[in-house]
Amino acid sequence: MLHTTQLYQHVPETRWPIVYSPRYNITFMGLEKLHPFDAGKWGKVINFLKEEKLLSDSMLVEAREASEEDLLVVHTRRYLNELKWSFAVATITEIPPVIFLPNFLVQRKVLRPLRTQTGGTIMAGKLAVERGWAINVGGGFHHCSSDRGGGFCAYADITLAIKFLFERVEGISRATIIDLDAHQGNGHERDFMDDKRVYIMDVYNRHIYPGDRFAKQAIRRKVELEWGTEDDEYLDKVERNIEKSLQEHLPDVVVYNAGTDILEGDRLGGLSISPAGIVKRDELVFRMVRGRHVPILMVTSGGYQKRTARIIADSILNLFGLGLIGPESPSISAQNSDTPLLPPAVP
């Protein structure tokens, strides 16, 4: 029997399927600055979109925190209990001083924001099926699996979003993960290792973290990149391999992990993609997936430079300008959903 969740509630038609909460952002006595990740980038993305008059608060969907019951759909209770130890959280987030904080503070200041982003991804999965597209301005914790975290990823939001859809939405039984973060997405790969319903395409720098050989067995379309890969080669490989992926496995939903750590100068990603290249990449993914009337859920994942927030905002503005997102009709695939379809908002 399915548990009761607060994450699958009706969303008014006046709100776009863009999910966010101010609680996404991690701020605690400057400790967040000890990790190269910009722990406030999610709020900056929203602020840029407001400045450009694309969005107002009344048009956003407020993310809810994933409950323990929600998390147990994927995670083991043992793993969730491990997160009650500050040492474990310090290891996962790669912020060593977290070891010395009382765990109640770690829960409130570090894990609650990550649980809220996780709830946002699950909510955005349902919205994507109803509306044809959705963006969680957060999430994409692709190094976390059911029983282990790492690389700033404490909860397996991608796995959770897909499993919620499989369990709760009629007609959703095949999914594709298009993971374009600079790092291998070993978390969801471990979770879906033997699940033929889920097709994983992963494009990543072959020389960097995590180098998880076991998890690579789950990748159906693997594209390994060399140091310093640039726009033309990258975009060509992305386009050709998405085309082949969608031919091999036409899904009922796509989860797009849109990491911006592919940006030139990112010392953890090691690739050399320009800001314009990232915007073009996102456009390619949306154009190819939406062109097949497949719902798409985008999460923002990694991106370790201060300018990534502006690039994410520019990409969303570009998608809107091209008509690839916006207050339009639901996707054709959504007609099979047992959740009531929301009528399109009036522009």
Curated annotation (Swiss-Prot):
Residues 14-318 are annotated as: Histone deacetylase. Its main location: nucleus. CDD domains: HDAC_classIV. The active site is at residue 143. It catalyses: N(6)-acetyl-L-lysyl-[histone] + H2O = L-lysyl-[histone] + acetate. It is an enzyme of class 3 (hydrolase). Belongs to the histone deacetylase family. This is Histone deacetylase 11. It comes from Macaca fascicularis. The gene is HDAC11.
